[in-house]
Amino acid sequence: MSRLVIVSNRVPVPDKGGIAPAGGLAVALKVALEEQGGGIWMGWSGKSSGEDEPAPLAQLQQGNITYALTDLTDTDVEEYYHGFANRVLWPICHYRLDLAEYGRKEMAGYFRVNRFFAHRLAPLVKPDDVIWVHDYPLIPLAAELRQMGLENRIGFFLHIPWPPADVLFTMPVHEEIMRGLSHYDVVGFQTDHDLENFASCLRREGIGDALGGGRLSAYGRIFKGGVYAIGIETAAFAEFAKKASTNSTVKKARESIERRSLIIGVDRLDYSKGLTQRIEAFERFILANPAQRGRVTYLQITPKSRSEVPEYEAMQRTVAEQAGRVNGALGAVDWVPMRYINRSVGRRVLAGLYRLGKVGLVTPLRDGKNLVAKEYVAAQDPDDPGVLVLSRFAGAARELQGALLVNPYDIEGTANAMARSLSMPLEERQERWTTMMDQLLEHDVSRWCRDFLNDLTASSDRCG
């Protein structure tokens, strides 16, 4: 079996006990390495300095996984990560042209850091290694590795949406981005819609096309484009939730909710998540259903994210102020309608909180997949499952047929879905939950990993 080398922007470094920070992508990639019998996971350490040259690559061995960590300079972080990756690629891929900020310095920094990553990675790679690169910060990495002479099989998976041509082409370096993807042997997307958008971009620009059989051509190269819907550790997460009832934090939450119905939302603080629209919909739901006053609690867990980017800092203030306004307008001495937590919660505790939720609110304006939706479903009690209210613009909506799909821009429609969820008969809730749970058990994170790597190792057409 070929050794697997994973490259991602950040690497979740295990602590002394071997426990890595929890998160959807982190968990998925660790499972991928474990199922391949180990390998290398390389990426940014999260550390930076004002030095012109970062410290040498650090390697940490945990079991059969080698974590290869590189520092970056302060300039690198600002231009590559906070700059081009998160002020250009992220908003463009989430259809937010109004938030994209183009700068030549940031664009140059993005490609420079990818070249730096390639130079740090290349000495670690053996001829028969399979390299799996993840997400938008590292799109040009394969091109840099090919330039250095590496002929390994290299795959890329995009965790966020791929936009339509008319959106992508507003980006000055869109052709360089598409050229970068053509250097991979397999390019994976979350949904068929994303793959169709990518193929359309190739055609519209006159640089390639879909050849059939999952093959794409671009810049004289042939590579595979595929859809690989990322999953979760379904069975394990369900067990977390089942056992979490004895957790002290979960117990306190259950006691504080008392007999009220819990509506729960869990999202990073990001403008793509539709948080302001969701809070407005909750307010509309209470105003339209006065009998629910004092009988429902909305818990929104929203860890801080990318605070160095001005748009995120501004949004943090906006969401906190909106939550305060709703509580001030609707609350009573003995009832706080909305609880807003602006920090991370441990994964096992989160599983228990999901299980308490009668309604799971997952209403992003645009999302590649959204693993929170899948975790909420997996955490439910089969005898009394909650209802998932899911944005039609989340990639997960194409898989979770038992959810109540909503348009997050339709405030009244989302409010109505909350009301319907809380009044839904048990039999219908169980039927919807069973449909979704069966899907999640069949298409879990192991299946995602296996499908992608099987296609990558079977690929016969190399880039270069």
From Swiss-Prot:
Any one GO BP annotation for this protein: trehalose biosynthetic process
EC number: 2.4.1.15
Binding site for D-glucose 6-phosphate: R10, Y81, D135, R306
Record's catalysed reaction(s): D-glucose 6-phosphate + UDP-alpha-D-glucose = alpha,alpha-trehalose 6-phosphate + UDP + H(+)
Binding site for UDP-alpha-D-glucose: G23, G24, R268, K273, L371, V372, A373, K374, E375
GO molecular function: alpha,alpha-trehalose-phosphate synthase (UDP-forming) activity
Pathway: Glycan biosynthesis; trehalose biosynthesis
Top-level taxonomic group: Bacteria
Keywords: Glycosyltransferase, Plasmid, Transferase
Site description Involved in alpha anomer selectivity, residues in chain: W90, I160
Pfam families according to UniProt: Glyco_transf_20
Reported function: Probably involved in the osmoprotection via the biosynthesis of trehalose. Catalyzes the transfer of glucose from UDP-alpha-D-glucose (UDP-Glc) to D-glucose 6-phosphate (Glc-6-P) to form trehalose-6-phosphate. Acts with retention of the anomeric configuration of the UDP-sugar donor.
Subunit structure: Homotetramer.
Protein name: Trehalose-6-phosphate synthase
Gene name of this polypeptide: otsA
